[in-house]
Amino acid sequence: MNVTYKRPFALYVKKAKKPLQLKIEDVVLDIQKNPALGEAKVGDLKGIFVYKFKFNQQEYLVAYQFGKDQKHLNILWIDFYKVGAHENFYDELKRYLKEVKQ
């Protein structure tokens, strides 16, 4: 399986304190085991999944996308787009996706 960490995701993890980095690492491993854990988004974010978790009484979200092999339904790739607190999360994610598509 090919796993890619997009720039906003990697920068957030790099700047986070070590305990949060370890929690994000655990979440990423859980998502790799079962990509359908997250909630599928609709509308502007169609195709994106968001997984929510709590750390130190704060809710965090992880946005990702994955692709399957159509014949065997094996997971071929996962792209992790963004991780962060709920505040402005979806607005920033939409802005990033719009910039990438241009």
What is the predicted function of each stretch?
Residues 1, 49-51, 62:
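Residue-level detector of beta-strand structural context in well-folded domains
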Residues 7, 43-46, 82:
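A general secondary-structure junction signal
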Residues 29-56:
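A short, surface-exposed loop/turn module that caps and links secondary-structure elements
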Residues 55-61, 65-102:
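Enriched for short, Lys/Arg-rich terminal
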Residues 12, 27-30, 92, 96-99:
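Residues that form generic nucleotide/phosphate-binding pockets
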